[in-house]
A protein has these predicted regions:
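Cell-envelope and extracellular/periplasmic
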Residues: 1-160
Length: 160
């Protein structure tokens, strides 16, 4: 999901033809947190155009473009992603409690996210990215999400 339009196949053509003012994108900074955050620092919403689309999430852009064409409604893309992360940092507390095989994590959530010796929060620990990047948008009317777990939890698919 962190793959950008500029990295896509036929990127130059896509960028030149990206004239979709009803599609907007906001990029969330990588921000692990030890407690749920109330807001997201950002540069604001970017209107989809040849001068902005190169930095949009590619999967989000292509999906959003399809939805806009099919539904004729404005599309807001939230670039909330961090390549190479496991699922645990993105999972809310209720997610751990809902899966019996994750009871070992659910019982120790008060210990997470953990801080490193230098005081920073390890972005791969449970709750870290949920707290810093997902929790701030929970109150808003989000109609759907695209989730790609990738290979960071390879071999654990039956667990979740």
């Amino acid at each position: 999901m962190e793959w950008r339009v500029r990295q896509s196949k036929n990127a130059e053509e896509e960028i030149a033809n990206a004239k979709h003012p009803a599609i907007r994108h906001i990029k969330f900074p990588h921000r692990p947190a030890d407690n749920p955050q109330a807001d997201i620092p950002s540069d604001g919403w970017k209107v989809c155009g040849p001068d902005t689309v190169a930095e949009f999430t590619a999967v989000g852009y292509y999906f959003g473009r399809f939805l806009h064409k099919e539904l004729d409604v404005p599309i807001g893309l939230l670039g909330c992603n961090w390549g190479g992360t496991r699922i645990e940092p993105w999972t809310p507390p209720a997610g751990f409690r809902a899966v019996p095989k994750l009871a070992n994590i659910a019982g120790t959530l008060d210990q997470f996210p953990s801080r490193r010796g230098n005081g920073t929060i390890d972005h791969q620990t449970p709750l870290a990215l949920y707290n810093g990047m997902v929790a701030p948008v929970i109150p808003y009317g989000i109609r759907g999400a695209i989730w790609y777990q990738g290979e960071s939890n390879n071999g654990e698919g039956m667990l979740y």
